[in-house]
Amino acid sequence: MAESAIARLRAWSDPRPGEGSLVEIDLFCLDGRLEVGDVLGTAVTPDGIEHAIRGEVLEVRFFDHMIDGLDPVFSGRVLCTGNLGPLREGWDVVASRP
């Protein structure tokens, strides 16, 4: 699998009622862009510790915005399913394209 994106998690929802492990996460991409079908495989804490997670991106809604006057970055919400384990706000998520 090729790396497709690195994104920083801003917030995430509890699983939707009746939809099992379906979760909506709010993030901005630090590198690349997430697409439907991408696999979330690694979460990295701010101090560099990696955690294995497993999720598949089911839906992506992106918009461009500025961060501290820098170039626009892709930001938005991702609907995904899987075992996101210990994922927390502020962690980076590495996605791969199968």
Annotated model-derived regions:
Residues A2-F28, V39-P98:
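Beta-strand/loop-dominated core regions that host nucleotide or nucleotide-derived cofactor-binding catalytic loops
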